[in-house]
Amino acid sequence: MQIQAPCPIDMHSREQQPQLSMSFASDFHQCIEGDLAVKSQIGVILPTYCETANIEKLVTEIESLGLPLSILILDDSSPDGTANVARSLQKKHKNILLFTRPKKSGLGTAITDGFKIFLSLEFPPEQIVTMDADYSHNPKEIPRLIEASQEGYELVVGSRYCQDGGTQDWSIMRLAISKIANLVTKLTVNAQISDYTSGMRCYSTDLVRKMIKDLHSHTYEIQIETIRQANLRKSKIEEIPITFVNRKKGRSKLSINEIKDFVSYILSIHRR
């Protein structure tokens, strides 16, 4: 397998239309490792940075679900060799794509990059699932997300705060901060859901195509921006309960600057 260097293309250096230009798609397709002609009903986006302790187990469990899916790993040039683990997984599973970004660039850009890549494929999936790559999200919840999506919901959120949802191994402080953030966001965005910051979701590809040009977040505020854009379009949004388990291996990626970006985004919405 030929190993690609980190992609030199800045996918965020220009405004992109909902339908990516053929020249732009051709450029970054050269940076993707794997079979770009893969056909799948479901695309799974896994943003990674230093996840060698988790990525093999996670991908193996996703594959064991037996769903018609493909997996897109977007690695921010992890110094621990996460991309090499992904390459070894590609030898076992032909439905895995790897996109190596030149540096740590934030969750928001990873998700929008993943959206753009799936939209640009010859055979785009019908649903796109996002989830954390640190095993905080249980891959066994994916079928329930897909089932709800197939009932006609354009965005399905795995909620920690709806009935039967929950968290494990969280400190009281972390739980309080999360709930306050969700309350403030609810007052600002006003979608009829309980969990705005959950990263485990299923989007219809049609919804992603409609809103991709309006997604500009660089970090964790992408979770709110996508719900806001879906709500502005009067999309059908549903929640299913999930249990979020605090990561057992590796370190949390959330930084003070990303918290500041999150707060700034909420304030910017409130001023509009």
What positions do the PLM features span?
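Acceptor/aglycone-binding surface of glycosyltransferases and processive sugar-polymer synthases
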Residues: 99-120, 127, 139-220, 247-257, ...
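A conserved acidic beta->alpha catalytic loop
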Residues: 75-84, 103, 135
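Short beta-strand/loop segment that forms part of the nucleotide-sugar
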Residues: 46, 69-78, 99-101
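Active-site beta-to-alpha loop of glycosyltransferases that engages the nucleotide-sugar donor
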Residues: 46-60, 77
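Hydrophobic helical membrane-anchoring modules
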Residues: 2-42, 57, 188-190, 214-272
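Acidic helix N-cap motif at the loop->helix transition within catalytic regions
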Residues: 53-57, 80-89
